[in-house]
Structures are given as structure tokens and as C-alpha cells.
Amino acid sequence: YKTRPNSVITRYGDRFEYASPEETPALMSDLVDWYNEEERKGELSPVELAALFHYRYIRIHPFEDGNGRIARLMVNYILSRHGWPMIVVRSRKKQEYLEALHQTDMVVGAIPSVGAHANIKQITIFLKYFEELVAKEIQTDIDFVTCKDEDLWWYDGEIITTRSKNIARILRLMRENPSITYAELTSSLGINTSAVQKLVKRMVDNGYIARHENGAWRVIATSVV
């Protein structure tokens, strides 16, 4: 566990305290005991249990670093062991996650030991955010496995939306032939080389594709077919 305080300065400029190094071992022991007891009782749904575990854990912040990642890993462990899909807090939406935690902190209060023993009624704001996140993940999984359109591609958990059909065509051509050249893309698409280069640059910038040192293309986006 941590050996020194790991308080943070929030984006609002105030200092937020987590559990002290002295408190941490006992609070973590309480957390594990509480989790085992709640699982045994079965009064909380898996989503409620995962959300409340996450919040309590975050208020302890038991390690020097990586607490958020470990919290989300434990959430997925709890969800998956109960047959629920795992979730991802995507980088571009991390602010929503942090804001939900902050608003919940305002309700629960600043004392770390109180936060580490919060109940489900106190974390309504974070629970609402968490339930919506799980619901979106379920819908994404359903959309992915039921879609049969070969022109639809996914990246970072969402359908790639673009006005240009050539994006999907380039992805398909690169997947079929990673060594394809700009000249071959131009010929296959029936558009000029400059337009192809602009599309490819946009795709690289968006993270849909990458180029190996040997010049071959790596398609990172995922086709639904």
C-alpha cells in the first residue's frame, strides 16, 4: 500500500484527501469483508455492487499510482463473474466519469473513512452514470453482433461515422492487402491520388490505421462482417 499521502488538486482548485497511509490497511480489509458479505447476501444487483465497490475503493486510493485503473479492473471482474459485459471508460469521455465521482463526493462528504463506507443511497449520482455506461456497453455489443453491413466499421467501441464511403473501402482494401500502394488505392477507388492521401491521413490521425516501418498497413478499426 501507499507509504505517503496521495491527495490531489481537483480541476476546481481544491485539495481532495484520500485515506491516509495509516488508515489504508484497515479500510481495505473492511472493503474486502464488506464485498464478500454483500455478494453472499445478494441484495445489491451486480451493477450496484460494482459501482459501490468502485466508489469505496477510489475513496481509499490505496496505492501510490494506478488506483483508477485497478478500480476499473475490479469493476470488470465483478461484472464478468456475474455474467455482465465488461465496460470501458474511454479516454475521450473520461471527464464525464470524473465529474460523476466529483458530484458524488460532494454528497458523501470529504472525510475519507466516510467515503470508504458509503452506502448505495449516497452514491446515486455515480450509480446513474455507471448504469448508463453499462447500458451503452450492452447496446454496443448487441449492435456489433447483429450488424451485417460490410461498410460499417468500429473503432474505440463506436461505429465509424463518415460521409465518405471510401473510408470503409480503404479499410477493406488494406485489410485484404496490407502492402497496397497509393497507386493501387487510387485505381481501385477511382479517385485521384491527392484525395486518397487526404483520406488516408485522416484515417491515421483518427487511429483507424497505422503504418509499419516496412510500409505495410495495419488496420486497427474492426469490421462487423
Show where each model-derived region lies.
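FIC/Doc superfamily catalytic core
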Residues: 1-225
